[in-house]
Amino acid sequence: MRVYFILILAVATVSGATSEMLSFQNAIQSSGGAKIETSAGRLLRAELTTDETYPEERTSLAAVEKLNAKTKDVLKDKWDAANVKYQSPFIYNDGIGQSIMKRNIDPDKVFKYLTQQKLDRTIGENPQYGLWKAYLELWKKNHPRWKSKLQTVD
């Protein structure tokens, strides 16, 4: 939930800054132009663009792309977790299990999303374990060569 709040806050900040910049757009003047009186007391000058690139600029672009990729991975993981938790009461229904399977979420991730911290067969099956077991059988039927990375799974 914090991620969504931060994302909404960032969008609101950017949109506020953009609308403020648009209000001062009439104060832009080229370098060789005549003097313009502004009511805001600010005057922005537009300079000719050059082909020069600065190393700091290129470094920041790489960092932004890296951050973008990591953010997409985290958001996809959170979205998949929310999707599995939302549909977990319906995994017994084969159609819902197939819809989760279309997202290529393997049973190890489903196990993690259902907040099963460890696989303990001595306690007995709780509802989340039953859901995970049903999904595991469905996954193995469609992916016979798949091997689980969990230690105690057959």
Curated annotation (Swiss-Prot):
Flavoprotein recorded as keyword: no
Motif RxLR-dEER per record, residues: 42-58
Main location: secreted
Keyword Cell inner membrane: no
Keyword annotations of the record: Host cytoplasm, Host nucleus, Secreted, Signal, Virulence
Subcellular location as annotated: Secreted; Host nucleus; Host cytoplasm
Induction of the gene: Expression is induced during host plant infection.
GO CC annotation: extracellular region; host cell cytoplasm; host cell nucleus
Signal peptide range: 1-16
Job description of the protein: Effector that enhances P.infestans colonization of Nicotiana benthamiana leaves.
Family, per entry: Belongs to the RxLR effector family.
Record remark on domains: The RxLR-dEER motif acts to carry the protein into the host cell cytoplasm through binding to cell surface phosphatidylinositol-3-phosphate.
Name of the protein in its database record: RxLR effector protein PITG_12737
Species assigned in the record: Phytophthora infestans (strain T30-4) (Potato late blight agent)
